[in-house]
Amino acid sequence: MATENPTRVATATPEATGADVVTRFAPSPTGYLHIGGARTALFNWLFARHHGGKFLLRIEDTDRARSTDAAIDAILDGMRWLELDWDGETVFQFARAPRHAEVAHDLLARGGAYRCYLTQDELAAMRAEAQEKRQPFRVRSPWRDRDDGDPAAPHVLRLRAPQDGAVTIADKVQGEVTVQNAELDDFILLRSDGTPTYMLSVVVDDNDMGVTHVIRGDDHLNNAFRQLALIRAMDWREPVYAHVPLIHGADGTKLSKRHGALGVDAYRDAMGYLPEAVNNYLLRLGWGHGDDEIISRAQAIEWFDLDHVGRSPSRFDFKKLENLNGHYLREADDARLAGLVAPRIEALVGRALDNADRDLLTQAMAALKPRAKTLGEIAEGATFLFAPDPMPVDEKAAEVLASAPEGLLAAMTQRLRGLDDDHWTSEDLEAAVRAEAEAAELGLGKLAQPLRAALTGRTVSPGIFDVLLLLGRKVSLARLDAAQHYPAGA
């Protein structure tokens, strides 16, 4: 690229539209798929699906010391859980190292790169000099304009970056951002052992994969200018850039583990969120469509664009995520929820659920899910259905039983025993409980609380009529009989 270039804007090539759109998600497998990465993947996926284009997945595993198979599995598992399907085969960057080196040598032959023989000591001296002058350290290699080095001697390949003029990126999120070429350095393309650097690999892979839109976190904005210098040196098509602000914690600081910067698997397993809730929340975390909060997948694909991605960092709010999850729990299919909740219940009650148990759990969902915010809350609320005999009673429930009016549970049990299996229905159960409350001259709540404690061992449960119906006549009467033997003041 000619050094006398004036300022150039990085949208010289027409922006791809429709089926020509190609986006990519390119995580490094050095850890889990964190929540910020999941949002980046979602935005790329939605943009591609909105345009009817392609969404590609590339695993940037060039850091061999830190890349692990477990991390790769976690990333792929997280993507599948979020239902962010990708087109074609997964690309593994390390396997393409020969192609990356080929481009570097091609650039060397064309004069766009040069061999640099600076030693580590020389680089350290240059760095110390920059620090002493309180200047940013940028490599200005004396080998840029020399060709008398020995190709057999240890060296790196550096990009011959432009030194004059400026570059402006017309970023779809950040707007126009300009950097003087003098602020850029001749970064390394190939290390002394011949391995390619991240900066080279990313540019080559994006070009070869046909990526038209690079949508990523704004912590990569500075890299874009260096990558653009390489793209122009190769005379390749320039992608459209969209650098999305990072997610911050509720206190406005960079998102960390204490804020919720956990792996996607933690939101699924430990916290019990549904993928549609996480997707909806991440979509609204930095992008908006008027006042719409609940956005279906079909609506998200139809509405998503880059014009409505905000420039300011979004703040992660667990309460909003929980509220969204509660909505999606209420909307979810009961059999699906039962399948998701069953393993949690098995862990809580210490036994496997058989088919009859799972059928009961599905039947109970309508009563369990209205007030729940997570799968864990549903599981906790359902344990009374599968409690062992004798049923555990928590401290608060024991206090309720101990303070119940003498004879109240016995009278209630006797009245319920008068209902046979054919009359163990919601209507008849409600009538019986209300009749006993009236006979005891108590409000319904005063009777329902000890009844709930006796039947569930807890003070919080689904409605008492639902509890009686779900437990059935035999179990309900057995638990009521057992509860009458709790010692006073227990």
From Swiss-Prot:
It comes from the Bacteria. It is found in: Cytoplasm. Pfam families: Anticodon_2 (PF19269), tRNA-synt_1c (PF00749). One of its GO terms (molecular function) is zinc ion binding. The keyword Nucleotide-binding applies. Monomer. Keywords: Aminoacyl-tRNA synthetase, ATP-binding, Cytoplasm, Ligase, Nucleotide-binding, Protein biosynthesis. A motif ('HIGH' region) lies at residues 27-37. Its main location: cytoplasm. It is an enzyme of class 6 (ligase). A motif ('KMSKS' region) lies at residues 254-258. Belongs to the class-I aminoacyl-tRNA synthetase family. Glutamate--tRNA ligase type 1 subfamily. The lineage of its organism: Bacteria, Pseudomonadati, Pseudomonadota, Alphaproteobacteria, Sphingomonadales. Catalyzes the attachment of glutamate to tRNA(Glu) in a two-step reaction: glutamate is first activated by ATP to form Glu-AMP and then transferred to the acceptor end of tRNA(Glu). InterPro entries: aa-tRNA-synth_I_cd-bd, aa-tRNA-synth_I_codon-bd_sub2, aa-tRNA-synth_I_CS, aa_tRNA-synth_I_cd-bd_sf, Glu-tRNA-ligase_bac/mito, Glu/Gln-tRNA-synth, Glu/Gln-tRNA-synth_Ib_cat-dom, GluQ/Sye. GO terms for biological process: glutamyl-tRNA aminoacylation. This is Glutamate--tRNA ligase 1. One of its GO terms (cellular component) is cytosol. Its EC number is 6.1.1.17. ATP binds at residue 257. It comes from Sphingopyxis alaskensis (strain DSM 13593 / LMG 18877 / RB2256). The gene is gltX1. It catalyses: tRNA(Glu) + L-glutamate + ATP = L-glutamyl-tRNA(Glu) + AMP + diphosphate.
